[in-house]
């Protein structure tokens, strides 16, 4: 498509005026179509073809002849409107893009056909894994979003619940604790202790009064401030605390006086310990008297009748085996029917008796060995 505007030396509007001045007959003869074509050609809207043979028309006949020649010839002129030109341009662009996409798809298909089957399989697997990964990522994002929403909702509910409870529960707790001090004091009075020392009563009372439960009850009652009953209970507990403090101070003074001793004891505790020790001494003194009364003075160990019979049998056998002189030297004293009188200390007498028995046993063993050898 070539457009030459250099040959149009004169203004088309001035040329149209000259044509009107030459004769009105040409205008009356020309049809509306010819006038439209002339205006469109003069205005040079959109021209398709070459404009080499275009020249200034002399009359309407020359214009009609030139138009007829241009229509019959190869180099014909076509006037296109701007809208039509735009639609054709868009259509040509779409056709070109379609052709490029078709050629690219054909090229890809040909490349896939030319590739190795293992490569195609791997590519398909990669695409499948990519789809699975994208699905997993989207699911994970949804789960995280739901978790954040749930966390925010629970946190808001907890905050709302805590704020709601803080006002009602505090009031109910205050009213409940205001009723507990009397019960706590009754429980303290029911506890009964049996002390060993009189001073332990004070210690146990201080321990009971120092326990945290009654103090907490009294403190709760003080904070509650429910009336005269609470104030009376508080006074009662204050009096007991003051009494326990006084007893505790008195005991400390007594213990400080006995700080020189190894064990700190009060006077009452000392008296109690002395009484217990006296009882123990009396018991110890009574037990030896009972033991000595069972034995006669000057008499030590005496064999039982069964043992005495056994010793008599041994002596009779020895008398048969030994000569008379040897037998008289080794025979037992119990066989004579009387006991030798022992003089001196009881301990010496027992030692002598033991030595005599050991000597007799040795002699008996020697005699038995001799008999076995013979």
Swiss-Prot record:
Keywords: Coiled coil
Basic and acidic residues bias spans: 12-28, 45-55, 65-77
Stretch list, region Disordered: 1-80, 95-120, 225-244
Coiled coil: 262-290
Family: Belongs to the FSIP1 family.
PANTHER family assigned: FIBROUS SHEATH INTERACTING PROTEIN 1 (PTHR22012), FIBROUS SHEATH-INTERACTING PROTEIN 1 (PTHR22012:SF2)
Name of the molecule in the record: Fibrous sheath-interacting protein 1
Taxonomic source organism: Danio rerio (Zebrafish)
